[in-house]
Every structure is written in structure tokens, then in C-alpha cells.
């Protein structure tokens, strides 16, 4: 059910899990083309897939839930008096303690990676999605332009599809056993740019994450990356309760070794060929400060409300 406001649309649903379905993606696209945004309203028990979360964030949408006390922004304790406030700034007087998500039982790893490809005839896209899950013994099984991703995973066919869409940027959704990912491909200056956000069940060590990224670098140029670990739902969705702050594991960013310094909590090494101007930082302790690395990369927590 949808309701129109002056500059946004309210879409209400009782779905237990909100996927990036073709219908929801179509609504966000149509509203966006008209200059508006979508506020999604669901019960507090609902959750979002990684694909839906990124689609919502990419179009400037909001997620609002109904609970016993009324309306609030998902992931926060910020209350709304009415849906007319869906895109208004939060007021401190309306903020209450956020509820806790009831399913925080498993450790999950998120790879957020940007890579650059030379547009050769032999190029195969999808390297991040295929190579990185191997660190935890996972493999992708399907892809599609919406969820559920039902086309059998095949990098050659995926590449043929994406080449047919160039120069238009294309967003894809990928599924696998305890694996969820989004993949965006667009044309850059003399290259194809691929951005992947990959969520896996399981915990990866700094050393394992480093080896996986260095393996990926042999196939493409990793321009930036951030690997983090959090605790969350077993179905790899995000609930509407208070969010767990991810623990950084590894980052790849621009920089020079002379500007960096190892200490007890981080270890810095050159990444890529000599003179590439990139460094890899391993956060060896859970209390390591990842703020500077995240700021350089322009990443935020995957579960934050807006990018």
C-alpha cells in the first residue's frame, strides 16, 4: 500500500523480510525519476536484505517501523509523531533508547570493495563476488537484477549481460549459501569500475582477509576496500533494533608507507605494485582505531541510515 506526499511516497508493508524485489525497485526508480523518495514502513519485527538496504540507501529512502510506542526510524530510538516527518531531521526530544535486535547470535563478515578493470576482450566481471567468499568456503550460486537472484552463477554470462548494458550503470544482486551481495558496474575513464558489498556468515581474521584481497589484486586493481566483522541475524538481514558497530579487520586505501606507522593495534604494508600509492592496513586488535581509514575510503557502516 502506498501513500503520496508532496515530495515523497510512503510504502507500507507487512512483509517479514523486505527484499529488493522488482516491484520495490521499480517503485524507487519511478519515484526517484519524479524527484521524490520512498519511506518504507513495516512492523518492527521486519528486516531488510543487504540488497534492499543498499537500494534504499542509494535512492535516499528511509525505513520506519511501527511498534507498541508508535513510529520510529529503524536502527535508532528516534520517534516520529507522524509519517509527515519521514524526511525531517531528528529532534532530540523525540529520541528514546533504541530497542535491541533479538537475533544477534552469529558473526558475519562484510567485504566492501571497489576494483578497476581494463576493458579487454577477455575480461570477466564478478571477480570480487567469486574470489572473496572463498576465504570462508562460500560460493555464489545466483545473480539477477532483483531479488531473489535466480540466474545460475556464471561469470561469462554475467559479463555478457553487463557489457550489453554499458554505458549505463548496472546494479546486480547475488545470492549463495549464507552469502548475500550487491554488485554495481559502471564505465570509468578508460576502465570498467566494479563496486561490491558482500556479506558472509562467519568470522575472517586480518591475515585471511589480507590474503583474499591480494589474490583479488592479481585479477583486477583493488582501488579501495574495507573488511569488517559484526554480529547479526542468521539470515544475513538487518533488523530494526539497535545496530551493532562493525569491527574493522582490513582496509586498502591510497597512501604511502612513509606516511604510515605500525603500532600495537595496526600493521601497514604496501599494496599492489611498487609506486601504486596504495597501502593495506591490518587492524590486529578489536580496539584499533579505524576512523582515519574509513574516512579516507568514504565508507560508512553498511547498516547506517544514509550514505
PLM regions with names:
Residues 120-242:
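Acidic, serine/threonine- and glycine-rich low-complexity intrinsically disordered segments
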Residues 1-141, 219, 223-307:
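C-terminal interaction module
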Amino acid at each position: 500500500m502506498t501513500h503520496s506526499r508532496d515530495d515523497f511516497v510512503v510504502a507500507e508493508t507487512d512483509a517479514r523480510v523486505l527484499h529488493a524485489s522488482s516491484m520495490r525497485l521499480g517503485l524507487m526508480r519511478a519515484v526517484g525519476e519524479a524527484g521524490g523518495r520512498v519511506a518504507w514502513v513495516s512492523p518492527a519485527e521486519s528486516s531488510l536484505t543487504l540488497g534492499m538496504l543498499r537500494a534504499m540507501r542509494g535512492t535516499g529512502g528511509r525505513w520506519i517501523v511501527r511498534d507498541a510506542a508508535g513510529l520510529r526510524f529503524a536502527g535508532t530510538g528516534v520517534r516520529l509523531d507522524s509519517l509527515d516527518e519521514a524526511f525531517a531531521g531528528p529532534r532530540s526530544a523525540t529520541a528514546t533508547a533504541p530497542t535491541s535486535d533479538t537475533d544477534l547470535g552469529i558473526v558475519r563478515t562484510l567485504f566492501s570493495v571497489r576494483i578497476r578493470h581494463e576493458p579487454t576482450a577477455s575480461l570477466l566481471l564478478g571477480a570480487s563476488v567469486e574470489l572473496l567468499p572463498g576465504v570462508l568456503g562460500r560460493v555464489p550460486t545466483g545473480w539477477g537484477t532483483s531479488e531473489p537472484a535466480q540466474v545460475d552463477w556464471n561469470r561469462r554470462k554475467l559479463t555478457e549481460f553487463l557489457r550489453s548494458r554499458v554505458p549505463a550503470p548496472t546494479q546486480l544482486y547475488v545470492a549463495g549459501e549464507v552469502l548475500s551481495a550487491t554488485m554495481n558496474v559502471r564505465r570509468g575513464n578508460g576502465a570498467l569500475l566494479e563496486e561490491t558489498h558482500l556479506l558472509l556468515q562467519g568470522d575472517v581474521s586480518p591475515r585471511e582477509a589480507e590474503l583474499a584481497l591480494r589474490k583479488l589484486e592479481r585479477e583486477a586493481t583493488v582501488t579501495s576496500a574495507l573488511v569488517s566483522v559484526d554480529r547479526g541475524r542468521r539470515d544475513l538481514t538487518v533488523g530494526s533494533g539497535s545496530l551493532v558497530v562493525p569491527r574493522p579487520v582490513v582496509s586498502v586505501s591510497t597512501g604511502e608507507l612513509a606516511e604510515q606507522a605500525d603500532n600495537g593495534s595496526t600493521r601497514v604494508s604496501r599494496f599492489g605494485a611498487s609506486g601504486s600509492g596504495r597501502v593495506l592496513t591490518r587492524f590486529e586488535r578489536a580496539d584499533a582505531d579505524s576512523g582515519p581509514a574509513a574516512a579516507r575510503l568514504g565508507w560508512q557502516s553498511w547498516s547506517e541510515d544514509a550514505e
